[in-house]
Amino acid sequence: MDLLNNAITSFEPTAQEENETWVYYSIGKKLKKQGWKIHISSQMTDALIIFEKVSKLLLQEKCNFKVAKNSTVLAEINSPRNDTSTANKFITIYPNNCKEARHLIIKLNDLLKDYQGPQIMSDFQLGINSPIHYRYGGFQARRVFNQEKNKIIHMIEDDKGNLVEDVRGSTPYTPNWVVPLFSEEEKDYYFSNKKETIYNSKLQNYHFISILKKTNRGNVYRAVKKDTEQPVIIKQARPFVGNSNDEKWMAINELKNEKMMLQEFLDKSYTANYVDDFYLEGNYFLVQTEISGKNFFEIALRNGVSTKQKEQYIQNIVQIINELHREGYLLVDLSPTNFIYKENGQVSLIDLENISNEKAPVRRVQTPGMLNQDTDLSIANIQQDYFALGMVAIAILIGHVLPVSKGDGKLNLSSMQKVMLVIDLAVESDDLTPYQSSWIKIVLKMSESTQTSQNIPMLLEDRSESLPSTLSNHSFSYDFHKEIIEITNDLLNRTVDKHGRIAKSSEFGEFISPLSIQHGLAGYIVMINKFYHGRSEKIKNLITQVNEVNNLLAPFEYENSLLFGRSGYLWSLITTFETSTDPDYLFFCEQIVQNLMEQYKNEKCVDFALGKAGILLSLMKYSSVIEDVQVDLFIKENIEEIFNSFSTISVNNLMEYAFAHGKAGLAYVLNCYSRIYKDDIYDDAINSFSDFIADVIRKQLLTGFDKLKSLDYFWCEGFSGLILYLCLVKQEKYQLLLIKAQNELFKQHLNMGTSYCHGLASLLQTIAYTENKELYNKIVIILLTRSYRDSNDYLVFQSECPSQSVFDFGTGTFGIYWTILKEKFLFSLDRKSKR
C-alpha cells in the first residue's frame, strides 16, 4: 500500500489537479507568473510525515503548491541517476509575494528542523542537509524553442518586461534585477548556514581539471594530485540522495561499495587503484587512479575501430567476467559504459559501485537495454550478467545499445525473442557477421539456463558453427486494427485538461499548440475518424471542449502551420466532415479557413511543415471538398510565391531539398496545385526537380547510407522524405529505384528510431506506395521489438525517448500504427467532387 499516495489523495482542498507526476493544489490566490518558489526535498522514509506537516501549514496559510503524486514518482525524482531539473523536488510551494515567501520559509524551517533531505542543486538550501530550498523562477510555464541549441528554454520576465531565460543550473542563481530573499547575515541568523571550508579538507590536495559527469548522486571529476602530479578520478556522493525505502542503500553506500571493490581488486590489472576517500559537508569523495583510453561513446563514434579490434574488446571483457564469476562476484550493472577501451584491444573495468558477492546479490540499478525485462529485476543473478554481456557485445559491434522493449504475452513475443529477431536482421543488414550473431545467441541463451555458473566461451574460439535465423520460423498473432480501436475509444472518453490536452506529449509537443496534427488533437482525430467510425458526436464533443480551452491560451509558435497548428487541425476536421457530413464540422472548418487567410500575410516561413506552403495545401484540401470561390482565388493568388521560393532556394545540403523544410515539400505542394486545378504551369519545374532528386538518391546508393547523421534517414529532413516525394509525384517512373533505395536505407534500421517524422515509420510510409512486401514485414518486426503494453494494456511503441511512449502522430504511437496499417501519406490530396 502506498501510504504517501493515500495521504495525498485524501487531502482535498479546492481545485485539485494532477498529471502523471504531480498533484496540484490551488488553495490561495491565482498563481503568479513568477516569483520566489520554495522546494521541499525528502528522504523516502520521511515523505509521508513531511507531506502531512507541510500540507497542513499551507492549508492554514492559503498557499498554492504541488507534490509528487506517489512513492513511485518520488523514487524516480530521488534517484541518484536523475539528471533532470526535477531531482529531489518533492513539494513545490508558490508564495504570493516575497513577504509571504520569507514568512513561510521561517515557519517551515522550524516545522522541519528535525528532518534532513537531499540537496536541490539549482536552489539555495537553508542549511547543510536542510530539506528546505528556494529560488527565483517561473510559476507558470513560459517557453521558447531555441533553434541554435535545439531545445526548449524556460523563460521569465526581467524588470523591463522582456523574456529572459529562467536559469536552472547546478548552482543557485538570482537574476540581477531581483533582490535576494535573505541577506547573508539573515541566513546565518535564521538557518545556521555556516559551511566547512575546503581548506580544512583533503580536497585542497587536488587540482581539478574538469567535470566528467553530473548526476543527482554527485559529480565525477578529472583531477591531479598536487604532490605527485598523478592523474586521478574523484567521485562524489551527496548525503541523503537515494530512493531506497529503508535508507540502507543511498548514494554514499553505493560509492563506498566501489571503494571496497577497488581494495578487493587491488591485484587486478584491469581496474583502477584506490587512492583516498574523505568527507566534506556530508559529501563523500572517492579518489582513484585515472585509466587512459576511450569511453564507449568515443569508440562508437569513431569510424576507425576495426571489427577485429571490437572483437578483441569483447574477448577481454569475457575474460574479466569469467574471472570475477569464478571468484564469486556478480557485476549486476553491466553495460558498455563500464569499460575503458584501449587502442591495443585491452579494456579496463570502471564504475564498480554495484558489483556484489553472489551469496548476497542485490539489484538496485536497471540500466536500460541491458536487462531481460521479462525476468524478475528485483534480484541479481549470474544469468542476468550473461544477458547483459550479450547486449554489451551487440552495442560494441554495432555502435549503440539495442532499444528492445519488454515482451508481450498477447503477441506471443518475449523480450528474448525480440532480441533474437533484431540480431538476425542485423546479420541481413551486414551489421553483424553470422559468427558474431551465433556467439551472441549462445551467451544470451546461457541467461535462460538454470546452471548457477558457466564458463562463457570466447568469441574467437570456434567460427565454424552458426545458429539458424529465427526470422523464417516465428509467426506473430496480432490485430493492429483492434489494438488501435481500443486506444482511440479510450481517448474519446477522456476529459480535456487546462492545457487543451487529453493525453501527454513530449516536452516539445507540449510547447506547441494542443490542436496540432503532429503532437495533439488533430492527430488523434485523424486516427479516430479513420479507424473508429460512428462516433461523430463524441468527436464533436471533444473538439468543442478543446476549442473552448484553446481560446483561453496564449499564442503558440507556428500556430497556423500544417504540422504544429491550425492548418493541420483544419485537415483533420475536413476528413471528419467527409465521413460524417455533419454541418457542425463544416462550420468549424469555415472559421479556421477564414482565420488562415486573414493571417497568411504575417507568416514568415514558406516551407511545407511550418509555413505558407503547408497552409496553402490545407486550403487546397478544403477546396477539394467544399465549393468556395473565395478560397480558390486566394490559393491561385498566393501559389506563385511558393514557386518563387522553390525556384530561388539554393541547394547546398540535404535539409535544403528535404520534404518538411526544403524544396521537396514545396514541389509537392506545387504538384498538388497542378492536379487540383488542372494547371500544368509548374509541371516542367516539378519534373526537372524530380529527376534531380532521383539522381541524389542514385549517388547516395553508390556511396552508401552508413555515414549519414540520424536525421538524414527520415521523412522530415532526410532520404525517407525524398523517397516519399518520388512516390507521390513520379512513382511509376522511379519504382525500381525507390525499392532499391528502401532496401538499402533499411540497413540503417539500428540507427533509426520508431516515429513517423524521425524514425522507421517514415520509411514504412513509403512502402504503402511501392508495395515492397518483404521489407514491410521486416520493418514491422523491428517496430514490434520496440513495442510494449502500457499500464492500460494498450500496445504502444517507443517514442523519441525509448523509455517513454506518447500517442502523438508525428513522434509517437499513432503515426506508427498509421504506417503499419498501410495507410497512404496523411497529406495526400486528390481532386474530389465538391459538396
Question: Predicted segments — roles?
Answer:
Residues 7-21, 183-227:
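ATP-binding glycine-rich phosphate-binding loop
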Residues 36-44, 209-211, 216-256:
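ATP-binding glycine-rich loop module of kinase domains
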Residues 150-210:
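Juxta-kinase regulatory segment immediately upstream of eukaryotic protein kinase catalytic domains
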Residues 260-270:
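Structural motif at the C-terminus of the N-lobe alphaC helix and the adjacent alphaC-beta4 loop
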Residues 273-284:
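Short beta-strand micro-motifs within the conserved protein kinase catalytic domain, predominantly
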Residues 313-314:
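Activation segment signature within eukaryotic-like protein kinase domains
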Residues 325-342:
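Catalytic-loop of the protein kinase fold
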Residues 355-425:
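C-lobe/activation-segment region of protein kinase-like
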